[in-house]
Amino acid sequence: MRIKYTVLTFLLFLSILIFSFPMRGLAGILDNQDYISIESGEGFWWKGHLRGVQVNNQRIGDINISYKPFTIFLGKFKFRNSISEPGISLEGFFGKTLLGDTFIEGLEITLLPNIIKNNTKIDLDNIVNLKAKIDFLVLDKRRCIKANGNGVAEVKDMFGLIPKSIKLDFFLSCTDSNIKIDFTSGKDGLLKGNLLIKDFYEYEIEATSNRLASRIKELSKLNFKKEPSIKFSGNLQQLF
């Protein structure tokens, strides 16, 4: 009987310890000066705030976090996250499954880059504005398992095709275990292509353009069976 009470007391103490773990403790665990910086944490791990979050020296702002306990019966550890700052609005669910998969659900994002606040800014050089929704994105370590989402963005013309900016519709999916984003400017064919995100944030972009093809044909006097395309690659961390 004494052993039983000892075990129950220990489990009760452990539950209280876990339940009362402060958000500032989580902030200390997540804080990595090389990539992630967090000024402070308030509340508890299951409901609280991370203040002054920076990722790769870019200010993200304050993040509100709340745990959804009943999702454990669905095999998930699910958290609702939200950010509301000048230049960025984000709200949705992040978490882990009992199998170890990372997931995002019902995430809505609005970006208005280059909005200055207290001498800091969200600096995404080629994006004028962006609005997107990720219905779901499931990742298994380095593999994309399933994804669905869409959005619209106004981007600066990176290819010298037009003097100002282009409005693009884009669509999220998985292909060959990679995250794939198809984008198009619509029926005008001004710009279309896809972005592949691979291991370790490596990406590849391939884009085609009716206007680019016309210019090349004029200069080369060649008739192409397939539209010429522009390809380049890099690391996503270089974009932030």
Language-model region placement:
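Extended terminal
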Residues: I3-L8, A27-N32, E39, L168-F240
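Sequence/structural signature of outer-membrane beta-barrel proteins
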Residues: N114-I116, K156-M158, S214
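Beta-propeller and related beta-repeat scaffolds in trafficking/envelope systems
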Residues: I60-I72, A132, R142-I179, K217-L239
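Residue-level recognition of well-ordered beta-strand positions that form the cores
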Residues: R51-V53, R80-S82, K133-D135, V152-E154, ...
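Hydrophobic membrane-insertion alpha-helices, especially the h-region
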Residues: K4-F21
